[in-house]
Amino acid sequence: MNRCWALFLSLCCYLRLVSAEGDPIPEELYEMLSDHSIRSFDDLQRLLHGASVDEDGAELDLNLTRSHSGDELESLSRGRRSLGSPTVAEPAMIAECKTRTEVFEISRRLIDRTNANFLVWPPCVEVQRCSGCCNNRNVQCRPTQVQLRPVQVRKIEIVRKKPTFKKATVTLEDHLACKCETVVAARPVTRTPGSSQDLRAAKTPQTRVTIRTVRVRRPPKGKHRKFKHTHDKKALKETLGA
């Protein structure tokens, strides 16, 4: 019993010394030590062990909170730096006029235009083509050296519900060299009065369309039955005058 009281007094003195030198001791620990439930060294160890576990957990939670808040602030600062800082953006480089690898689709028209009931394998291949931009809109990136390359593909047909494989040859076009060349644009034709085309049109004789009116002659009227047999015109006039 005396040993427990000695340990208790020494612990109180140690706590006072620690509180004077460093962080303050929690009041809960003094309340637990002042309780008469401590009857043995094991009770004191259990009490201190439980208190140390609680303190370690609180310290761990505090450290985690500090670390998470620090990480969040650091990530937030990085995000602001990447979005708002102009030093992150790299200078833009022009896409030079040169040969680049492109994907070329092998269509069925290149193999057989009369039949469409087959498949081509492989469906696409890689070719070298000129691409890029030039310094002026009046020039374009065009190939200056071209090479034709024949390749062999498979033509797969379904005959009587069974696949048949045939070989076919397709000629591919590869660009070996490129250059920015001037594009000759078609100039719009502006006609001015007195131009050569107008003079030619003036010299060309114009055909006049003349409309003729054709009079349709009516058939002669027949003689009356009374004067049908009178052939002498003079006698006929005298008869009519009478």
Swiss-Prot record:
Coiled coil: none annotated. One of its GO terms (molecular function) is growth factor activity. GO terms for biological process: cell chemotaxis; cellular response to mycophenolic acid; embryonic placenta development; heart development; metanephric glomerular mesangial cell development; monocyte chemotaxis; negative regulation of gene expression; negative regulation of phosphatidylinositol biosynthetic process. Residues 219-232 have a biased composition (Basic residues). Disulfide bonds join 97-141, 130-178, 134-180. Its main location: secreted. GO terms for cellular component: basolateral plasma membrane; cell surface; cytoplasm; extracellular region. Residues 21-81 form a propeptide. Residues 1-20 form the signal peptide. Residues 219-242 are annotated as: Disordered. It is found in: Secreted. Keywords: Cleavage on pair of basic residues, Developmental protein, Disulfide bond, Glycoprotein, Growth factor, Mitogen, Proto-oncogene, Secreted, Signal. Glycans are attached at residue 63. Antiparallel homodimer; disulfide-linked. Antiparallel heterodimer with PDGFA; disulfide-linked. The PDGFB homodimer interacts with PDGFRA and PDGFRB homodimers, and with heterodimers formed by PDGFRA and PDGFRB. The heterodimer composed of PDGFA and PDGFB interacts with PDGFRB homodimers, and with heterodimers formed by PDGFRA and PDGFRB. Interacts with XLKD1. Interacts with LRP1. Interacts with SORL1 (via the N-terminal ectodomain). Interacts with CD82; this interaction inhibits PDGFB-mediated signaling pathway. Belongs to the PDGF/VEGF growth factor family. This is Platelet-derived growth factor subunit B. It comes from Canis lupus familiaris.
